[in-house]
Swiss-Prot record:
Principal place of residence: membrane
Keyword terms: Glycoprotein, Membrane, NADP, Oxidoreductase, Transmembrane, Transmembrane helix
InterPro entries (alphabetical): NAD(P)-bd_dom_sf, SDR_fam
The protein's name: Short chain dehydrogenase/reductase dpfgH
């Protein structure tokens, strides 16, 4: 048997074992739901304060958690830019949202063409936003990735820079309340153990061993590395904003086991049908994002919340050891910024 065939056989065996291993946590999840349910605690969207006059951007706002994040922000008076790549899907989502919620003014939900895989197009969106608005109060980096794709940039980097540049007075206004929310997941704990974000290659191909790229393990590792990057990015953003005395609060979060296409795609094929029955609905999954973006207690006690990782509305959790690696966070920021600056994108903001 040739070495190539031996390698392929080993990959298939390990991948099958990995896929089978996922049944155990799903079984535990089922038992937990049977006994305790999937409640998110005492906080829900009814506690969102009035947001009249505020401007928000929600990436990936046309479906899943993002859709319900847009819905509840707009219903409380915010003007929400629904960031999405597909015009037809975005407008269909807006049409559905307005039909289901006739009290939301039509002008409160606006499509923002936003393809996070295209840096130039993301900057176009940021420039468009700056031309239309004098402020940006809330950015929810919610858009996920397809686990079959490689990571190209830290999710939402350019839009996060737009928050900073669209709010030049944020550092001087003590009463301002600007928040950047980055949606991660508990999958951040299952990233590649060797990835330290020391080179652009660590973003492009987190599963460096040849042959594993499209395996179940490779897809899960790619997903986990993306989610790890989300947490590191949010923490590093907060550190930098604090250094500049900018009144910007950065949070990352785990929305929970939510019934979305992204969650299903990470699972082995034979497990995916169980997602529908075991995972919670996207509307409930949006609660943590909404708490992070709007809860008044975060503004009132900002030092307690700055840079934190939430595991439910109002629940601060210590993320994995790797997600607390400040050096990796700085490395991630630096290689991402270098990659974006190399395109000339930031010069346009």
């Amino acid at each position: 048997m040739s070495p190539l065939w031996v390698r392929r056989l080993c990959i298939r065996v390990v991948d099958s074992l990995y896929g089978s291993f996922l049944y155990l946590p799903l079984a535990i999840l089922f038992l937990k739901r049977s006994v305790t349910g999937f409640g998110t605690g005492e906080w829900d969207e009814s506690q969102i304060p009035k947001l009249d006059g505020k401007v928000a951007v929600v990436t990936g706002g046309n479906a899943g958690i993002g859709y319900y994040t847009v819905k509840h922000l707009a219903s409380r008076g915010a003007k929400v830019y629904l960031g999405a790549r597909s015009e037809s899907r975005a407008k269909a989502a807006i049409k559905r949202l307005l039909e289901e919620n006739p009290l939301i003014p039509q002008e409160n939900v606006v499509w923002l063409r936003l393809d996070l895989a295209n840096q130039s197009q993301v900057v176009d969106a940021a420039v468009e936003l700056q031309s239309k608005e004098q402020r940006l109060d809330i950015l929810v980096n919610n858009a996920g990735i397809d686990p079959y794709d490689y990571i190209r940039t830290a999710d939402g980097f350019e839009m996060t820079m737009a928050v900073k540049y669209t709010n030049p007075a944020a550092a001087a206004q003590e009463e301002s309340d600007v928040r950047v929310i980055t949606v991660s997941s508990s999958g951040e704990a299952y990233s590649s153990p060797t990835n330290q974000f020391t080179s652009p290659k660590d973003l492009d191909d987190p599963c460096a061993s040849p042959g594993w790229e499209n395996s179940c393990l490779g897809q899960a590792m790619r997903y986990g590395t993306t989610k790890l990057a989300n947490v590191l990015f949010a923490s590093e953003l907060q550190r930098r904003m604090d250094e500049e005395d900018a009144n910007i609060i950065s949070l990352s979060l785990n929305p929970g086991t939510v019934r979305t296409d992204g969650a299903a795609n990470v699972m082995p094929f034979m497990v995916r049908p169980l997602v529908r029955f075991l995972f919670t609905a996207p509307e409930r999954g949006a609660d943590t994002s909404l708490f992070a973006a709007t809860a008044e207690e975060i503004k009132e006690n900002s030092e307690r919340w700055k840079g934190r990782y939430l595991d439910g509305p109002g629940r601060i959790k210590v993320p994995s050891l790797r997600a607390r690696d400040a050096v990796a966070g700085r490395n991630l920021w630096n290689i991402t910024e270098a990659a974006v600056r190399g395109t000339g994108a930031l010069d346009r903001l």
